[in-house]
From Swiss-Prot:
The chain crosses the membrane at residues 9-29, 50-70, 82-102, 115-135, 161-181, 186-206, 245-265, 273-293, 313-333. The gene is nuoH. One of its GO terms (biological process) is aerobic respiration. It comes from Parvibaculum lavamentivorans (strain DS-1 / DSM 13023 / NCIMB 13966). HAMAP family: NDH1_NuoH. The lineage of its organism: Bacteria, Pseudomonadati, Pseudomonadota, Alphaproteobacteria, Hyphomicrobiales. GO terms for cellular component: plasma membrane. This is NADH-quinone oxidoreductase subunit H. It is found in: Cell inner membrane. It comes from the Bacteria. NDH-1 shuttles electrons from NADH, via FMN and iron-sulfur (Fe-S) centers, to quinones in the respiratory chain. The immediate electron acceptor for the enzyme in this species is believed to be ubiquinone. Couples the redox reaction to proton translocation (for every two electrons transferred, four hydrogen ions are translocated across the cytoplasmic membrane), and thus conserves the redox energy in a proton gradient. This subunit may bind ubiquinone.
């Protein structure tokens, strides 16, 4: 019995502690990322943004948290109560579970699995289920139409993201996220794969329902989309899941194209900075790009969104996969692992 506890109990306890620490850190970072998003949007519109709760509004997200927690959860008449309440939980759990394989530094990862990129792709694909469950269970036409839009949108852009990932893994020669970062020591992949970087960034906006691709929650058409019937903690969980997913896509952009935790130049003093600092700086830089797109770019029409995904991104990404394979084989530079 003691041997079993030592063999399985201690490693499980360590993983549980690491997971708890990661979740707490993610929730804190998400609170301030949400505040930064609101501040950036306000600055673009020549406003101050949240500035009352705490110094410079730094405690605004926590005030919003308390406000949501103490409000009443209202379930619409005729709604499927079980699925209605399960939908936000599914969204949050899937968003958080994706971070289990994200390496913040060379050895700072909970599960350094060999198919990490495949795991992330699967988790991000499942995220649409929370939206569909919410739209169907609300027993209202606006959430239902929003769920249909979200399903079509996410499926459309998953295809392009898949081909982008194929280009990166062919160049790196591995599905392991740590190995992909290490393979960028000579050159970050956004330089040779610049078109794929642009496609991945724009597809990430569509995948996370960020403007200008927030068709699923377009206020002028669908009120608040699939969240229109939600209130209190359930609504807060949807917002939390959305921003954790955004941070996950920012982290994936950093790992696949921006060298992860690697410094821009491998000389002093750059290589003296801890890798996790470089990783977080790159993630926040990508999020800043997300926020600026939200502030400046108007929302696309639904037909424009579908046309961009199927008639522009899909052919370009497919062509780039063939081109990458041809270059690797033609110049005999296929990575050996």
């Amino acid at each position: 019995m003691t041997d079993v506890l030592i063999a399985y109990g201690i490693p499980l306890a360590i993983i549980a502690a690491q997971s708890l620490a990661l979740i707490v850190a993610l929730l804190l970072v998400t609170a301030y990322v949400l505040l930064a998003d609101r501040k950036i949007w306000a600055a673009v519109q020549l406003r101050r943004g949240p500035n009352v709760v705490g110094a410079f509004g730094l405690l605004q997200s926590f005030a919003d948290l308390l406000k949501f927690v103490f409000k009443e959860i209202v379930i619409p008449a005729g709604a499927n109560k079980g699925i209605f309440l399960l939908a936000p939980l599914v969204t949050v759990v899937l968003a958080l579970s994706g971070w289990a394989v994200i390496p913040l530094d060379a050895r700072m990862v909970i599960a350094d699995i060999n198919v990490g990129i495949l795991y992330i792709f699967a988790i991000s694909s499942l995220g649409v289920y929370g939206v569909i469950m919410a739209g169907w269970a609300s027993n209202s036409k606006y959430p239902f139409l929003s769920a249909l839009r979200a399903a079509a949108q996410m499926v459309s852009y998953e295809v392009s993201i898949g081909f982008v990932i194929v280009c990166v893994l062919m160049t790196a020669g591995s599905l392991n996220l740590t190995a992909i970062v290490e393979s960028q020591r000579t050159i970050w992949y956004f330089i040779p794969h610049l078109p794929m970087f642009v496609i991945f960034f724009i597809s990430a906006l569509a995948e996370t329902n960020r403007p200008p691709f927030d068709l699923a929650e377009a206020e002028s058409e669908l009120v608040a989309g699939f969240m229109v019937e939600y209130s209190s903690t359930a609504y807060m969980m949807f917002m939390l899941g959305e921003y954790v997913s955004i941070l996950l896509m920012c982290a994936m952009t950093t790992i696949l194209f921006l060298g992860g935790w690697l410094p821009p130049i491998d000389i002093a003093p750059f290589n003296m900075v801890p890798g996790v600092i470089w990783f977080l700086l790159k993630v926040f830089l990508v999020f800043f790009m997300f926020a600026m797109v939200k502030a400046f770019v108007p929302r696309y029409r639904y037909d424009q969104l579908m046309r961009l995904g199927w008639k522009v991104f899909l052919p370009i990404s497919l062509f780039w996969v063939v081109l990458t394979a041809g270059v690797l084989v033609g110049f005999d530079i296929v990575p050996q692992h």
